[in-house]
Amino acid sequence: MKLFLLAAAAFSAPALTVSELNHIKSLNPRWKAGIPKRFEGLTKDEISSLLMPVSFLKNAKGAAPRGTFTDKDDVPESFDFREEYPHCIPEVVDQGGCGSCWAFSSVATFGDRRCVAGLDKKPVKYSPQYVVSCDHGDMACNGGWLPNVWKFLTKTGTTTDECVPYKSGSTTLRGTCPTKCADGSSKVHLATATSYKDYGLDIPAMMKALSTSGPLQVAFLVHSDFMYYESGVYQHTYGYMEGGHAVEMVGYGTDDDGVDYWIIKNSWGPDWGEDGYFRMIRGINDCSIEEQAYAGFFDE
């Protein structure tokens, strides 16, 4: 009975600890570590539910048309999509207890690039739930492949979040692919991409793609120290690999110490990181952040 109680206590114990935080701080990372409000009291399983198995990142190489530019010389030194297109980017959202980061980041990239292209009369928040429920080439709350979801967004597309709001964060289930809006008022109307490209591992091309046509969907390997991120330019410092995560890259820059970084929008809500965003070191493929960089295109 005593062993059972000890095991139960360990299972329900908070995943982030002061002792591990202090160890990370002792390594003097260039970024600020803490226990984010988003993760206070959460168990290891609850935090792990936000991630995907690493296999979703490793099995995707060479799975999409390559993106490149003949001229990469006129790339600006810095770019922040939030500043250049403040009317486009919606609020930071929270994927909840579902490993649907692949859907959130692809749909966010899809919507923001449509906004840059001027295809919507007003900025539209598109539905990650429709993608989770209807894209059977991916695994709903258990993860997804970036090339697969972009194939889905070109062949099928997605609808608005108003029509099909997000539920899987609380249910942790795929749900049924809807044919009507949640309120039953109208048939689901779908917007699609015409094509997609992968700019991964070509940093100048990634920078030019960001500054000329909008955000990119990227993915990286998450280590335990990343869960303690609060601010600054993250670089992996300590800990085991916990899984994979897909996010929306929205810009790049250089800090006061001359460290190049990417600006990235997460899907863990505004109580994590720099108001829901984080910066990650640029140019060394830290945690494989530069291996995949997907962009959708629209010829409407």
UniProtKB/Swiss-Prot annotation:
Q: SUPFAM superfamilies, from UniProt?
A: Cysteine proteinases
InterPro entries documented for this protein: Papain-like_cys_pep_sf (IPR038765), Pept_asp_AS (IPR025661), Pept_cys_AS (IPR000169), Pept_his_AS (IPR025660), Peptidase_C1A (IPR013128), Peptidase_C1A_C (IPR000668)
Q: Which residue spans traverse the membrane?
A: none
Its annotated compartments are: Vacuole
The residues the entry assigns to the signal sequence are 1-19
Q: Which GO terms describe its biological process?
A: proteolysis
Q: Name one GO molecular function term.
A: cysteine-type peptidase activity
UniProt-listed Pfam families: Peptidase_C1
EC number, UniProt record: 3.4.22.-
GO CC annotation: vacuole
Question: What keywords are assigned to this protein?
Answer: Disulfide bond, Hydrolase, Protease, Signal, Thiol protease, Vacuole, Zymogen
Disulfide bond sites: 88-115, 98-141, 134-177
Note the CDD domains from the entry.
Answer: Peptidase_C1A_CathepsinB
Its primary localisation, in coarse terms, equals other
Q: Where is the active site?
A: 101, 245, 266
What protein family does this chain belong to?
A: Belongs to the peptidase C1 family.
Function as written in the Swiss-Prot or TrEMBL entry: Thiol protease which is required for parasite excystation and invasion of the proximal small intestine of the human host.
Name listed for the protein in its UniProt record: Cathepsin B-like CP2
The record's gene field reads CP2
